[in-house]
């Protein structure tokens, strides 16, 4: 597979190696960008930049892309910067000039200074500003649409010259700008799944609507056996008399001309002129007004909100559909949808065709024989903004002359084109479904129950609309039952239809048993098909008001009664061309090997989930009539056996602190984790983990990442990263080698070195950075003796503790108390609680001076305040009334730990507190008096006591 847009003509081993190297680089750059974007939009936060480090990482990935393939500056002998490339946005896109001009003026105003801002710094500032303002994709589209302008700054192997990768890059940027992870599903997964190319090149066509002016000349080695397929327009070019190579086209009629986009990339101008395929006339080109580059970039469908396309069409609410849907082959529609090819020369009404090709690919050998002469017939079609999905898409909307135009959601064709011999009958199968019945009806399923399908909704659409990826395990279990029931019901209904069809055919054969009549009918049928196929193109030329109509069949019809393609030579005469079931089966067999493996998305091919199995089974019946989901008879009705989540036990542990909020625990919540893995919990760890043994630790984790639970093969455990805080191993997505100080190492070893921690641990440590959670006295009291700075802070906190208690009862110390409140409360109200911020400030020597200043201010207040002087102590040993002492005077005062009395250090030598002795003596005296009172009361009644004793003796 060649890198699209890499316009190079290389031959030999060097050219192949260069192309392979550029492919690997493109793959790596796009993979890094998509990984970063997935991490940003998967958090479901209102602000995508709330994820720590997300903006810096996305800036780095975009810088790598913009620097890739830059032409070196030959004059200054240095690498050029992309600032010269992007600053011309102000000319190409004036509405985006505001974001660039401010940085241009910044650069030009500082050029005269010696410390001027370099171009590289200005470019990085512009890139970061554009990402923050969510306007980077809008600024890059006009630049990336002009390939000649890109070649002035980039080499041919640059990332920006690969159309497919640029389209995926823009989709990633739009996913971030809109905070919509569903846009990432539109990216072709094959670009990430393989680095090597297959011998037979099957290129998936892309919707390159953002690159209207792209051209490409293929390498000489790729001239043969290159197939490009897209079912959005099953049209190819006949074999040229000058060349025998096959050429097929993937139409994207949103550019300036009617020439197919892939064809413009693959054919040189000379080859295009010699192609015998008829092109539209000048009058036809004049009638159609294609969108400009900006309008086309604005109308590119990247989100459900942009699908409305209010600039050129009036959409009805029922036409808007959200989410990826898959084609239900032959789905019956309650409202007939027709696609007509009408000429608008009478009313002068312009309509642009937007047949964007999807991410699916197929071999179009049969398409070259089936629709090789239809290009002129596509004079004008209603614009329909297509949505990319895992299957190919392409459907035109009906346009009635002079009436209101409205666009509908397009769905896939069947990826089937019949392959016939040269000159034989050419058959085409176009099967569509009604998108109105499927759009705008996504109801919220309560408690894991599948909602009932809407009337006329297709089976594949009904199965694929469920968000299986984000459901809990219990809901996935119920999903298996629902999907199994729907498949069984669909298969049984098809069997019944086939049996009834066989019985009808046998009855018809019995009636028409004459062999000659049967042969004559067969010859007439073949002859009519040949005549209609040959007259297909002239019929379109002669018809001005003719219609190209695709009518979806009814659900009661069998699989043989496929869609009818009606075309007429005049408005009055009409011939119906019926497509037989045998033609569908032949085309399905011819494309079975390639289309099935290519149309299914990458995640479906490598998944064993219920939805993947169901979609794979339904693809086996491609081209056949499938019943609508609403027509199925469910094996077990939901009202008889409702599918709900299993009940969670009501007896949940309630914290004593949350007793007043106990009612919140009655809510039924989903249980995260499973028997093998549980997500990390925010916990405070005080101990240093022992040196880990990787094999043993990972085995204890059941070979799963401690953060996301993803399973790792034992051969790849070396890729896991160790978190020093939690002591567990994480995958590279959950552990980005962030470095933080570890609390346990500070408390045990006074080690402030930064260690590698997981993203979860980093976020947790940042959240608790200022929380006083660490009691040094309880965790490691020996740290006071080992660390001098920490002991000094402890003494200052003891003084502040006593001062604050004194000032709370002093009416003259209100201003001083306000200054005490400037520092965190735990520093003045507790003696041993610290936060990580306090410990770090102590290590740097910043906390001690702040506390010392408060201590000096408090001591000065006590010295001149009469109220505070009255709260002092007089030493009972020396009885010096002139020397009043206070508890915060640690240099000369000693406080009793029991009674809190204060004495001079020099006087308090015996180790016994006089106040404690007095209190003890008083307690003993009170106890003695209580005992004497009890005994006196007992002696006043001796007779009663003797009588009681006698009674007791008699009873014994």
Swiss-Prot record:
Annotated PROSITE patterns: RUN
Classification via CDD domains: RUN_RUBCN (cd17686)
Region named Interaction with YWHAB: 205-437
SUPFAM superfamilies cross-referenced by the UniProt entry: RUN domain-like
Region (Interaction with CYBA): 552-609
MF term (GO), any: phosphatidylinositol 3-kinase inhibitor activity
Pfam family name, one: RUN
Biased composition (Acidic residues): 570-579
Region (Interaction with UVRAG): 302-585
A Gene Ontology term for the protein's cellular component: nucleoplasm
Biased composition (Low complexity): 233-242, 339-371, 547-566
Gene3D superfamilies linked: 1.20.58.900
Localization (cell): Late endosome; Lysosome; Early endosome
Highest taxon above the source species: Eukaryota
Region (Interaction with BECN1): 490-542
Region (Interaction with CARD9): 656-744
Biased composition (Polar residues): 270-319, 379-395
Region (Interaction with Rab7): 705-956
Alphabetical keyword list: Autophagy, Endocytosis, Endosome, Immunity, Lysosome, Phosphoprotein
Region annotated Interaction with PIK3C3, chain positions: 50-181
Residue span(s) of domain RUN: 49-190
Modified residues (Phosphoserine): 198, 250, 268, 390, 412, 513, 547, 655
Subunit structure: Associates with PI3K (PI3KC3/PI3K-III/class III phosphatidylinositol 3-kinase) complex II (PI3KC3-C2) in which the core composed of the catalytic subunit PIK3C3, the regulatory subunit PIK3R4 and BECN1 is associated with UVRAG; in the complex interacts directly with PI3KC3 and UVRAG. Interacts with Rab7 (RAB7A or RAB7B) (GTP-bound form); Rab7 and UVRAG compete for RUBCN binding; can interact simultaneously with Rab7 and the PI3K complex. Interacts with CYBA and CYBB; indicative for the association with the CYBA:CYBB NADPH oxidase heterodimer.
Function noted in UniProt: Inhibits PIK3C3 activity; under basal conditions negatively regulates PI3K complex II (PI3KC3-C2) function in autophagy. Negatively regulates endosome maturation and degradative endocytic trafficking and impairs autophagosome maturation process. Can sequester UVRAG from association with a class C Vps complex (possibly the HOPS complex) and negatively regulates Rab7 activation. Involved in regulation of pathogen-specific host defense of activated macrophages. Following bacterial infection promotes NADH oxidase activity by association with CYBA thereby affecting TLR2 signaling and probably other TLR-NOX pathways. Stabilizes the CYBA:CYBB NADPH oxidase heterodimer, increases its association with TLR2 and its phagosome trafficking to induce antimicrobial burst of ROS and production of inflammatory cytokines.
Protein name, per record: Run domain Beclin-1-interacting and cysteine-rich domain-containing protein
Species of provenance: Mus musculus (Mouse)
């Amino acid at each position: 597979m060649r890198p699209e847009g890499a316009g190079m003509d290389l031959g030999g081993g060097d050219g192949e190696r260069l192309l392979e190297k550029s492919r690997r680089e493109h793959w790596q750059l796009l993979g890094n960008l998509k990984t970063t974007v997935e991490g940003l939009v998967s958090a479901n936060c209102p602000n995508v930049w709330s994820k720590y480090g997300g903006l810096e990482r996305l800036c780095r990935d975009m810088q790598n892309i913009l620097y890739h393939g830059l032409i070196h500056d030959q004059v200054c002998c240095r690498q050029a910067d992309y600032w010269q490339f992007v600053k011309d946005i102000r000319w190409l896109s004036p509405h985006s000039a505001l974001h660039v001009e401010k940085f241009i003026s910044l650069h030009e105003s500082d050029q005269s200074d010696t410390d001027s801002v370099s171009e590289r710094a200005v470019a990085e500032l512009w890139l970061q500003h554009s990402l923050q303002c969510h306007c980077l994709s809008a600024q890059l589209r006009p630049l990336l649409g002009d390939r000649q302008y890109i070649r002035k700054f980039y080499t041919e192997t640059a990332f920006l010259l690969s159309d497919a990768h640029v389209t995926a890059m823009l989709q990633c940027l739009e996913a971030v700008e809109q905070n919509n992870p569903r846009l990432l599903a539109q990216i072709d997964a094959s670009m990430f799944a393989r680095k090597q190319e297959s011998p037979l090149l099957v290129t998936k066509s892309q919707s390159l609507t953002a690159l209207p002016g792209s051209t490409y000349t293929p390498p000489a080695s790729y001239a043969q056996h290159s197939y490009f397929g897209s079912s959005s327009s099953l049209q190819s070019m006949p074999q040229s008399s000058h060349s025998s190579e096959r050429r097929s086209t993937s139409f994207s009629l949103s550019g300036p001309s009617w020439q197919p986009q892939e064809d413009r990339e693959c054919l040189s101008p000379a080859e295009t002129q010699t192609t015998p395929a008829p092109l539209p006339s000048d009058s036809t080109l004049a009638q159609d007004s294609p969108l400009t580059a900006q309008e086309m970039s604005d109308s590119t469908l990247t989100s459900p909100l942009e699908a409305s396309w209010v600039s050129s069409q009036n959409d009805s609410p029922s036409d808007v559909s959200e989410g990826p849907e898959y084609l239900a082959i032959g789905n019956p529609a309650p409202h007939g949808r027709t696609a007509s090819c009408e000429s608008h020369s009478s009313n002068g009404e312009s309509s642009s065709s937007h047949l964007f090709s999807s991410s699916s690919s197929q071999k179009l050998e049969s398409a070259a024989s089936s629709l090789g002469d239809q290009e002129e017939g596509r004079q004008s079609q209603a614009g329909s903004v297509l949505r990319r999905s895992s299957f190919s898409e392409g459907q035109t909307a009906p346009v009635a002359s002079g009436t209101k135009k409205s666009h509908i959601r397009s769905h896939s064709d069947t990826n089937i084109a019949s392959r016939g011999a040269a000159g034989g009958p050419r058959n085409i199968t176009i099967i569509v479904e009604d998108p109105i019945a499927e759009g705008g009806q996504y109801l919220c399923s309560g408690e894991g129950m599948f909602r009932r399908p809407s009337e006329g909704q297709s089976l594949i659409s009904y199965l694929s609309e469920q968000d299986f990826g984000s459901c809990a395990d219990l809901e996935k279990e119920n999903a298996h039952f629902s999907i199994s029931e729907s498949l069984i019901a669909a298969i049984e209904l098809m069997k019944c239809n086939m049996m009834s069809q066989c019985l009808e055919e046998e009855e018809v054969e019995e009636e028409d048993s004459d062999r000659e009549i049967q042969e004559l009918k067969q010859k007439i049928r073949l002859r009519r098909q040949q005549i209609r196929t040959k007259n297909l193109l002239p019929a379109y030329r002669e018809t001005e008001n003719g219609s190209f109509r695709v009518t979806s069949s009814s659900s009661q019809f069998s699989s043989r009664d496929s869609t009818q393609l009606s075309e007429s030579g005049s408005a009055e005469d009409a011939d119906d061309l019926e497509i037989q079931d045998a033609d569908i089966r032949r085309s399905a067999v011819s494309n079975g090997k390639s289309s099935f493996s290519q149309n299914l998305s990458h995640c479906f091919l490598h998944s064993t989930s219920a939805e993947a199995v169901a979609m794979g089974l339904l693809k086996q019946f491609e081209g056949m009539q499938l019943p609508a989901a609403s027509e199925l008879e469910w094996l077990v009705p939901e009202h008889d056996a409702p599918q709900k989540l299993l009940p969670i036990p009501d007896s949940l542990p309630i914290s004593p602190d949350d007793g007043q909020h106990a009612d919140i625990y009655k809510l039924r919540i989903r249980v995260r984790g499973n028997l093998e893995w549980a997500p990390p919990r925010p916990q405070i760890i005080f101990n240093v983990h022992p040196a880990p043994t990787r094999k043993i630790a990972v085995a204890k984790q059941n070979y799963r990442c401690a953060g996301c639970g993803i399973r790792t093969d034992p051969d790849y455990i070396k890729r896991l990263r160790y978190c020093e805080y939690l002591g567990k191993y994480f995958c590279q997505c959950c552990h980005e080698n962030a470095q933080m100080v570890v609390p346990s190492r500070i408390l045990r070893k006074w080690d402030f070195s930064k260690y590698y921690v997981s993203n979860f641990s980093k976020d947790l440590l940042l959240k608790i950075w200022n929380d006083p959670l660490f009691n040094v006295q309880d965790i490691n009291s020996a740290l006071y003796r080992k660390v001098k700075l920490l002991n000094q802070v402890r003494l200052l906190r003891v003084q502040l503790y006593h001062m604050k208690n004194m000032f709370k009862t002093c009416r003259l110390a209100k201003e001083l108390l306000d200054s005490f409140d400037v520092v965190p409360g735990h520093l003045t109200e507790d003696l041993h609680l610290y936060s990580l911020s306090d410990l770090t400030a102590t290590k740097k020597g910043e906390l001690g001076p702040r506390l010392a200043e408060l201590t000096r201010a408090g001591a000065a207040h006590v010295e001149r305040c009469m109220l505070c002087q009255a709260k002092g102590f007089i030493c009972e040993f020396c009885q010096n009334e002139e020397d009043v002492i206070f508890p915060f005077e640690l240099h000369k005062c000693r406080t009793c730990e029991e009674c809190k009395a204060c004495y001079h250090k020099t006087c308090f030598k015996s180790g016994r507190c006089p106040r404690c002795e007095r209190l003890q003596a008083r307690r003993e005296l009170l106890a003695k008096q209580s005992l004497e009172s009890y005994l006196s009361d007992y002696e006043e009644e001796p007779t009663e006591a003797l009588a009681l004793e006698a009674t007791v003796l008699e009873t014994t």
